[in-house]
Regions:
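ABC ATPase nucleotide-binding domain "signature" loop
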Residues: 1-3
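C-terminal lobe/lid and adjacent interdomain/linker elements of RecA-like ASCE P-loop ATPase modules
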Residues: 6-74
């Protein structure tokens, strides 16, 4: 089942504080965690005629904001 919004917010804040002195790499579907990141990468899949490919790209600040809103609406 997962964690509640309040716990996710606390987790995000703890990770943000930890990131001040070390590198933190997090894979999450929680907008409360993703909202606190300094750099946001989007991992997505793309189907071709032959196979499914996985891609990753860094989001701009504006794209980050839009992705957080999209995550919140799910």
């Amino acid at each position: 089942t997962g964690v509640s919004g309040a716990i996710a917010s606390q987790m995000g804040e703890i990770m943000r504080q930890m990131a001040q002195s070390r590198q933190i790499i997090t894979i999450t579907h929680l907008p409360q965690v993703a909202a606190r990141c300094e750099q946001h990468y989007l991992v997505y899949k793309e189907d071709t005629d032959v196979r499914t490919e996985t891609h990753i790209r860094q989001l701009s600040d504006q794209e980050h904001d839009m992705e957080i809103e999209k995550m919140r609406s799910l």
